[in-house]
């Protein structure tokens, strides 16, 4: 009986240890791929920053971005929805060898080796729209944040729309209050806890000293800057 109980206890302990280890393997973002990621980049890769306000996509601007990326391999980062934006880039904008989309749901995924390999080989990186507070929480001070800076330093283009634009300035509205403060509330208490201006995210020389945000008139946001 004693030996049986001991075996049961050891088995239970082993299951607990396994359960404790599982999150380390589960921290992987959703991944969507279109095209051939091993194909040769057709054109010359050049530096460039694309800042899109959001809403309807400007295809002329997107084609400029794809050309800056040598019409090669694009990696899209986001923290909501799925791979639709990659389908749009590949099937509607067109003219690229491949597009990979990673959808993050936690900070741990920003250390995933597969993500970092994709970012290192990317000809262009695009930050999708969404909730910029997730981007701050998931990417600031992580290997993904460092990879974005390294990408730009290497002379490759970086783009973003809406929240993905907001993340590019040296200073940005982070929406860390759990909402999206509007002008009357921000101006009533400009130094209050709802006015979350963040920094120490990306270190882009062209946007040094610049604060970025979007949807000013449509969503009554100008006062929060």
Please describe what each predicted stretch is.
Residues 1-15:
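Bacterial N-terminal signal peptides that target proteins for export
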Residues 3, 123-129, 146-149:
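Short, contiguous, well-ordered secondary-structure segments
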Residues 17-19, 168:
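Hydrophobic, well-ordered secondary-structure scaffolds
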Residues 21-24:
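N-terminal signal peptide c-region/cleavage motif recognized by signal peptidases
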Residues 27, 136-222:
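Class I SAM-dependent methyltransferase SAM-binding "motif I" and its flanking Rossmann-like core
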Residues 27-135:
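Extended, subdomain-level signal for the structured scaffold at the beginning of enzyme domains
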Residues 225:
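Active-site-adjacent alpha/beta core region of enzyme catalytic domains
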